[in-house]
């Protein structure tokens, strides 16, 4: 999701790498699930997120899309996101005790919260959001430990590649709207269906490693 932000307004003003320490440790979020409520369609999922959910829940992507996930247009491209459910607008994976039922394989956005990503120059750095988490007694922890992600450098490159791949597509789709000779709606739908089919719906290899190759994913 493309956002124009002022880091001075939403963060502590610093940019972090995964080797830095930041006040992210919420001590297990004991008694709190605020960040799992009222998120609308903002928890957009990348292909690895969906692969992990599908594999660990033993459900096809199409099955997930009829339950805890949904599709929405994000800057001109149709992408999946976590669905908020029930009257309290809670994440579909939140149980009645306010605990995450997919915590071990939760999506990347959930995994890094209350951190965000600041993208530039085909890469990104982390920033600490200061208004999003109600916990005031957070402890400092090394970011790579907080992320708890295997092969972190490879994963971070994948995240950057995926972000800028989508950004380039989204800019192309948005520019079509200003071309009176182009079938912008039809082209946007075709691009969206290609992204969904190629990167989300078509099964990856059993180890999912082909997900790190955004331009030429290996299929089985």
Model-derived features with residue positions:
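Residue-level detector of conserved catalytic or cofactor/ligand-binding positions
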Residues: 212-220
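Hydrophobic scaffolds flanking metal-cofactor catalytic centers in soluble metalloenzymes
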Residues: 1-183, 197-211
């Amino acid at each position: 999701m493309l956002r124009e932000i002022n880091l001075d307004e939403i963060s502590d003003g610093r940019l972090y790498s995964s080797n830095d320490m930041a006040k992210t440790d919420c001590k297990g979020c004991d008694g709190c699930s605020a960040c799992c409520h009222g998120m609308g369609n903002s928890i957009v999922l990348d292909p690895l997120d969906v692969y992990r959910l599908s594999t660990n829940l033993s459900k096809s992507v199409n099955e997930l899309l009829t339950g805890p996930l949904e599709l929405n247009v994000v800057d001109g491209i149709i992408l999946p996101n976590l669905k908020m459910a029930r009257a309290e607008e809670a994440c579909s994976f939140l149980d009645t005790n306010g605990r995450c039922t997919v915590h071990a394989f939760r999506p990347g956005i959930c995994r890094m919260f209350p951190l965000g990503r600041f993208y530039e120059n085909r890469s990104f750095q982390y920033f600490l959001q200061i208004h999003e988490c109600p916990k005031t007694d957070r402890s400092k922890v090394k970011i790579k430990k907080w992320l708890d992600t295997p092969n972190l450098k490879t994963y971070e490159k994948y995240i950057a590649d995926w972000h800028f791949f989508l950004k380039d597509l989204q800019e192309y789709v948005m520019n079509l709207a200003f071309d009176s000779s182009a079938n912008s709606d039809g082209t946007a739908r075709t691009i969206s269906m290609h992204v969904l089919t190629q990167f989300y719906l078509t099964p990856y290899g059993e180890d999912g490693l082909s997900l790190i190759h955004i331009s030429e994913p290996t299929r089985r």
